[in-house]
Regions:
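N-terminal, motif-rich segments that launch catalysis or mediate targeting to/interaction with membranes
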Residues: 1-121, 128-244, 248-253
Length: 253
């Protein structure tokens, strides 16, 4: 998920926090003097990406779970370090940092880091191509044309293009989404588990977000495929549902 998407999810989560929860969040972030982003809750939603790209590539695998499109297996795609083997991924790390955040014994510094990761990973897990792989690095190896000279890869299309086509202002987008969420939707999403969220994103990736096998198997630098007619408007209607849910997934809803 790109900057705008993460900030929209965080802004939506802020809408649903109780005053007491907001006070606690602000108190945690007030102890954090990291300069990679601005210090507020919404800006901190992108901290994990800045940290990864400024000398911490070992955290890269934490942002996704590569479940094979044709044979999804969450257990083999991701294992928490304590289980041995495999590698940590977005589901195991989200659960880990949620535990760190809620543990009374956690240090002040570790609690701030955990909060920043939780903000970020809740968003990443709801970007469909962070939950599935089609032998194309989650769509990163599939180039697509957006019309004219505009090209991108399929992963970036879902990270950023769909978001900015709908509303480039993250806070305004969050306000719009907040107005559309019913109490029934909120309660259902809040009751979900991390594993359920991941499988929901996987299902969306499999049935909606991927390009055909023929295009997937084309060389990475081949001429970009054109988006099918109507794809962008259809995705623009679909994607907001996957921002509403992570924004509502905080226990403070």
């Amino acid at each position: 998920m790109g900057v705008e998407g993460h900030e929209a999810v965080a802004a939506l989560a802020w809408h649903y926090m109780t005053p007491d929860t907001r006070t606690k969040v602000d108190a945690i972030l007030a102890t954090d003097h990291d300069a990679l982003t601005a210090p507020d809750f919404i800006a901190r939603s992108t901290w994990a990406d800045h940290w990864r790209t400024t000398g911490h590539p070992e955290t890269g695998a934490w942002h996704f779970i590569n479940m094979e499109i044709d044979h999804p297996d969450m257990a083999s795609a991701c294992q928490a370090p304590a289980q041995g083997g495999g590698q940590a991924c977005v589901t195991s790390q989200l659960e880990h940092f949620e535990h760190v955040l809620s543990d009374p014994a956690t240090t002040v510094a570790d609690r701030a880091v955990a909060l920043k990761y939780v903000i970020h990973f809740v968003g990443d897990m709801h970007q469909p191509l962070h939950a599935a792989d089609h032998e194309d690095r989650g769509g990163n190896c599939v180039r697509i044309s957006l019309g004219g000279a505009r090209t991108t890869n399929l992963h970036s299309y879902w990270d950023t293009v769909v978001v900015t086509e709908i509303d480039p202002d993250a806070r305004h987008l969050a306000d719009r989404l907040f107005d559309q969420i019913s109490v029934t939707q909120k309660d259902a999403w809040q009751a979900g588990t991390v594993a359920q969220w991941a499988m929901d994103s996987f299902g969306l990736a499999k049935h909606t977000c991927t390009i055909s096998t023929r295009l997937r198997d084309a060389p990475p630098m081949a001429r970009p495929c054109r988006c099918p007619p109507g794809m962008m408007p259809r995705h623009a209607r679909l994607q907001p549902g996957n921002w509403k849910r992570p924004g509502c997934g905080w226990h403070s809803c």
